[in-house]
């Protein structure tokens, strides 16, 4: 147990006054305190405690945020699948979350056997644990979808417009067998994941952005595996061409696609598909 003691040290020149306090809660040296909770440097600064390292008020306890700043999906993040020209399914697919199409009508849903709600604002389907929205539904659905599509396009432009990548043309575009760490990744051509799969390693605070100016393909039976606690929502695949997930493959993350996305038979995804053209599911699963 510390006794309460105050020591003041005065010096001239560039050095300021330093106060050392030994008290029951620990030791305090000016803005620095050492106590049962760890080490803290000033309000909102650096703290080292039982949970790990917190760098500044935005970092949160437990880790240092690594990688680029998050991509803000806006209201597009309210959808497991959002597309501008249609969403199709070869039954039975399973979708957990809302799906939406805009600026087109409900005819853009294919294979869902949807039932319009009595309000006229949304529809339901046995293949969707959530609601289906189309631009032809009753207000406020059209306006809500217009905003969501705009937010989707803004998110795509943000993700593809980031500069100063941490990694350029990694693996020559083949990610199979690699373990990826947080950062901004940029390629000048197509990207693929072979059947070996790829591992993405990071904490719950880390972020990944993959800039792909061509096609993105996941081979049949390939897997994206997450380790370290990073959530799928912190991973963005931004592709300017077609995205294809082969039969039995598994994807983690948010797919921001300039064109179409296809999930082949038995493919699964934990994340969101936000496509500026079409999404096709072939007895696939999307958990949004």
From Swiss-Prot:
Q: Does the record bear Signal in its keywords? A: yes
Motif Ice-binding site motif (T-A/G-X-T/N) 1: residue span? 75-78
Name the residue ranges of motif: Ice-binding site motif (T-A/G-X-T/N) 3: 196-199
List the InterPro entries.
Ice-bd_prot
Motif range (Ice-binding site motif (T-A/G-X-T/N) 4): 265-268
Q: What is its main location?
A: secreted
Query: Glycans attached where?
Result: 194
Annotated keywords: Glycoprotein, Secreted, Signal
Source domain of life is Eukaryota
Indicate the annotated site residue(s) for Ice-binding. 110, 192, 265, 280
Motif, Ice-binding site motif (T-A/G-X-T/N) 2: chain positions: 154-157
Residues of the signal peptide: 1-22
Q: Where in the cell is it found?
A: Secreted
One Gene Ontology CC term in the entry? extracellular region
Write out the function statement from the record. Binds ice crystals and most probably inhibits their growth in order to prevent cell damage from extracellular ice.
What protein family does this chain belong to?
Answer: Belongs to the ice-binding protein family.
Q: What is this protein called?
A: Ice-binding protein
State the species of origin.
Answer: Lentinula edodes
């Amino acid at each position: 147990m510390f006794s309460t003691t105050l020591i003041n040290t005065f010096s001239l020149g560039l050095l300021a006054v330093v106060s050392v306090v030994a008290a029951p809660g620990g030791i305090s040296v000016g803005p620095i305190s050492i106590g049962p909770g760890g080490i803290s440097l000033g309000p909102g600064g650096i703290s080292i405690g039982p949970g790990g390292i917190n760098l500044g008020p935005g970092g949160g306890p437990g880790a240092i945020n690594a990688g680029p700043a998050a991509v803000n999906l806006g209201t597009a993040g309210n959808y497991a699948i959002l597309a501008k020209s249609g969403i199709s399914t070869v039954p039975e697919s399973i979708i957990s979350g809302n799906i939406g199409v805009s600026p087109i009508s409900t005819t853009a849903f294919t294979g869902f056997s949807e039932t319009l709600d009595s309000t006229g604002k949304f529809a339901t389907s046995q293949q969707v644990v959530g609601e289906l929205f189309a631009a032809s539904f009753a207000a406020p659905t059209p306006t809500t979808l217009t905003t969501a599509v705009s937010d989707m396009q803004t998110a795509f432009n943000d993700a593809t417009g980031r500069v100063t990548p941490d990694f350029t043309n990694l693996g020559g575009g083949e990610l199979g067998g690699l373990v990826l760490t947080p950062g901004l990744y940029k390629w000048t051509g197509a990207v693929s994941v072979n059947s070996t799969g790829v591992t993405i390693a990071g904490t719950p605070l880390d972020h990944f952005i993959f800039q792909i100016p061509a096609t993105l393909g996941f081979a049949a039976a390939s897997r994206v595996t997450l380790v370290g606690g990073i959530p799928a929502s912190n991973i963005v695949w931004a592709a300017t061409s077609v995205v294809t997930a082969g039969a039995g493959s598994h994807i983690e993350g948010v797919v921001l696609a300039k064109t179409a996305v296809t999930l082949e038979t038995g493919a699964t995804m934990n994340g969101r598909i936000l496509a500026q053209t079409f999404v096709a599911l072939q007895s696939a699963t999307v958990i949004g």
